[in-house]
């Protein structure tokens, strides 16, 4: 190492590779011979995901490709933890934010590396939020306010990268705008400082400042609106994040119903029927109670006792569970708080409460946190169904192509649930990059739902592409689509 005039150490030979592990960097063995200085990066530097890399290229091979856009802070090729094999992708961080933007603009889907069939992917890593945590939606603006007025309003909270007032085709303001800050902290400060803080001139209510919807949320909302316009989508779906809280509320309400059941004129079956109204929020549809069940109900609990009570509810698309061998309903544990079980039902009739909750087990695998309370309270009886991807009957399985890159299994299920009971839904993912292949399969339990979904969603445009929705080909065909 040779000392430069300014006192900083300069390497005597070839410089060390940047962005590799400490072992690669060659840490000094003594205080007289310190290791190379660690490169500094901007506080708002962007971590890039690089995909479609030949598996024969390592960090040293990739470095010349990216160095022309700026100094590299870190470059790491992803490898399988168990096998150590190259995954065909990497993470890249430049010292300067501008360097990352230049590299993304020049390389993303612009150049195909030797041996690859698709162009290289260079885009912000998922952990960076793609700027979604910095972009704000501003509502309830005055119609007279333009971009400069909005900038002055938000300027005290940090550096504004973008500011756009949404306008109608005639140029008049829609009373809302998008504002993008340089960092997440600045965006959060603006939300805390401005949301609901004032009412702008000409606005009907206080100012709205919140994070803008993500691409995934916008695409999903557009699909659901499309389904609603065609009459296939009636009640709005319960947001996935709210399911856990809602199921907890159901179980709490159940306790109140059981207490009420001790009063005169309200038997266990009537209490179950009342409770079923709240289960309807989970896409369950009304079905009449079988006469055999009413015949076996204890005195005072028949339909005539409460003439205005709605009929109990069955499960959309799923049949009743097989009753237990002792003839008692599967939910008899509900009546252990001072209540005697009513007489055994006929062998062909399942308890309505157990029947209603049965369908939730089909979704418990997809949303374990949401349905955990229900699964615990109502254990599922043994099922002969396999756990792998299931298909519906012939004519009920759909192939969907041109899905948004951000869509996963959960979004696919929620998109096609409006058309009927979904048996299974799967988005195919590249094993090497863990990125969506933008196609998948959805299976319904009946051909009518499948045909309705095709009519509603085939050709539906998202961005620059249109969805392709068609029946999956038979298994003996060469291709499934």
Curated annotation (Swiss-Prot):
It comes from the Eukaryota. GO terms for cellular component: cytoplasm; nucleus; ribonucleoprotein complex. SMART domains: RRM. InterPro entries: CELF3/4/5/6_RRM1, Nucleotide-bd_a/b_plait_sf, RBD_domain_sf, RRM_dom. It is found in: Nucleus; Cytoplasm. Gene3D superfamilies: 3.30.70.330. One of its GO terms (molecular function) is RNA binding. Expressed mainly in kidney, brain and testis and present in other tissues albeit at lower levels. Also expressed in fetal kidney. Keywords: Cytoplasm, mRNA processing, Nucleus, Repeat, RNA-binding. One of its GO terms (biological process) is regulation of alternative mRNA splicing, via spliceosome. Belongs to the CELF/BRUNOL family. This is CUGBP Elav-like family member 6. It comes from Homo sapiens (Human).
